[in-house]
Design a protein with these regions (language model features):
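Nucleotide-activated chemistry modules centered on ATP-dependent adenylation/adenylyltransferase
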Residues: 1-231
Length: 231
């Protein structure tokens, strides 16, 4: 059912491309979704579309959207409310009540890790492999160190991104191309957790990997700040 909604969005996108073409630019490194269209169109709008169009959520329902933003991540998120009416709320027309709750809004990064530690939850392979942030794989806000990690683990994808710069005639960063941006920066990849790297390369992560069976350890990417992703 969710797949049907996503496919409908893709059909609409194809029609829009026929009318006005594609953007032919990377998202802007800005704070608003108008220029940074990736966050709005590829993340928020997808969830909104599913909620508004899926038969089981379209009308006569009460929905709680739970998300993990923290005020300490950025000045923008510091202004977020813990609980509020979600943008897909449509009580009068469709009797659809949608609230949003951010349960960890006032948590520090250490608070979050302590919750995972208490329940022996295995951190995402990204963190265990050295990434300080589990965001889009090649987020426009990624630092040179993070892009160097992409270049190491996903050389074909990195090359495709370089090629996109040439095809579009625009660079990912507004001051230099990808090669200049990354340069000879050392990769963020931590090679001490082979299983994490295997999961990232293969995309395999099973239910058996959810919990840590031995001692819980902070991942290599912990406590390196929130830089490298949109806020």
């Amino acid at each position: 059912m969710v797949a049907d909604s996503v496919m409908a969005n893709m059909d609409s996108l194809n029609k829009l491309e026929e009318i006005g073409g594609k953007r032919h630019k990377f998202p802007a490194k800005g704070g608003t979704h108008q220029g940074r269209w990736c966050s709005g169109n590829l993340k928020a709008a997808v969830q909104d579309s599913v909620t508004a169009n899926l038969e089981k959520t379209r009308q006569g329902v009460r929905i709680l959207v739970v998300s993990g933003e923290r005020r300490g991540e950025s000045s923008g998120r510091s202004k977020y409310n813990e609980i509020e009416i979600h943008r897909t709320n449509a009580e009068k027309k469709l009797k659809r009540t949608v609230h949003q709750w951010r349960p960890v809004i006032d948590y520090s990064e250490k608070d979050v890790w302590e919750v995972l530690k208490r329940h022996k939850v295995n951190p995402h392979p990204c963190y265990r492999a050295g990434w300080n942030r589990c965001s889009w794989a090649m987020c426009i806000f990624s630092t040179p160190k993070l892009f160097a990690g992409i270049r190491e683990l996903y050389p074909e994808d990195f090359e495709a991104l370089r090629n996109d710069e040439n095809v579009l005639g625009f660079t990912l960063d507004n001051k230099c191309n990808l090669d200049e941006f990354v340069g000879d920066t050392e990769s963020c990849v931590y090679h001490g957790d082979k299983e994490a790297i295997r999961s990232l390369i293969t995309g395999e992560f099973t239910t058996d990997d959810i919990y840590v069976k031995g001692d819980w350890l902070y991942p290599a990417g912990a406590f390196h700040g929130a830089e490298g992703g949109p806020c």
